[in-house]
Amino acid sequence: MAVGILLVGGFGTRLKPLTEESPKPMLPVAGLPVTEHQILAAKKAGIHTLVLATSYLAEVFTPYFGDGSKWGMKILYAVEKEPLGTGGAIRNAAELLGRDEPVVIFNGDVLSRHSIANQIAFHQSNNADVTLHLIDVDDARAFGCVPTDSAGRVTAFLEKMDNPVTNSINAGCYVFSPQVIDEIPFGTVVSVERETFPALVSQGRPVFGYKEQSYWLDVGTPAALFKGSRDLIEGDYQAMPGTTIAADAQITGGTSIGARCTIGAGVHIEDCIIGDDVIIEEGAILKQSFIAHGTHVPSHTEKVATYLSKKLDLPINL
């Protein structure tokens, strides 16, 4: 068994304008918030308690996720008044957890289908202090890379370089032994990636890399968020319960449509993400656009690469 912490406090700067009115972990991907996809993965791995480490727009999480009973687990909330970095957020959230089980840390803007249960088992079999999920990418120059020895033990954390020594990169899911979290200073800005992990390796502590080449995507930009939604849908479109679609509406490109929406006659939608409770009137044409929760799109509206809400109409850089 294990417990978990979801790091969902970021400002989502790279995702603007989609994050003007919503924190990035609450943006819909294939009809569900990014965080809900992670909660489902955590549940599958046997994680019974999760702490959402929140900051920006923290008030939107509790009404949606509640106490976690909908997912058969316990969900708690730790709110940062000021951002504390990944390490500070982990240390703050861990105050709500016990110290007798591994702690799985989820990066708030990653979609992954790797086996968290296998990562936990690998961590325990190696008596590791920390075990990172690593993936191999074709071109590691845009990432910091993480070389390991033949046993999977991490030997260094290297910044971006023109000639990487390995294609293995940090995929953003960590398993901590609880006593290691207690070593992170409380109430202090700390980056586990830049400070904690390199320090552990330099001290000769057991830090391991768990490699699994399953589906993985950082959805931290608008283009990546749209891609992630398309990847999960694997078809022309997906509509959540309660949505009605006119018989002659044309919906393609892996479009995601939220719950209780109304799609009018003659509407053309291609490669869009549409929130819950949206009304799109007849003849509207929407391409590569994000239509926020509760938006009313008038008839014959034409939008391409646009963030549209009740209050905003902004271009999206895709």
Describe every region a protein language model picked out.
Residues 237-250, 255, 261-263, 267, ...:
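A structural motif detector for beta-strand N-caps
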Residues 51-55, 133-134, 290:
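Short internal beta-strands
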Residues 11, 108-110:
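Active-site metal-binding loops of divalent metal-dependent hydrolases
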Residues 102-104, 111, 117-124, 137-140, ...:
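Catalytic-core segments of class I nucleotidyltransferases/pyrophosphorylases
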Residues 126-136:
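A short, conserved acidic/glycine-rich loop-to-beta-strand motif
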Residues 26, 146-148, 197, 209:
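A structural signal for short hydrophobic beta-strand segments in well-ordered beta-sheet cores
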Residues 2-6, 28, 32-107, 116-118, ...:
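Conserved N-terminal catalytic core of the sugar/cofactor nucleotidyltransferase
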Residues 1-28:
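Mobile, glycine- and charge-enriched loop segments
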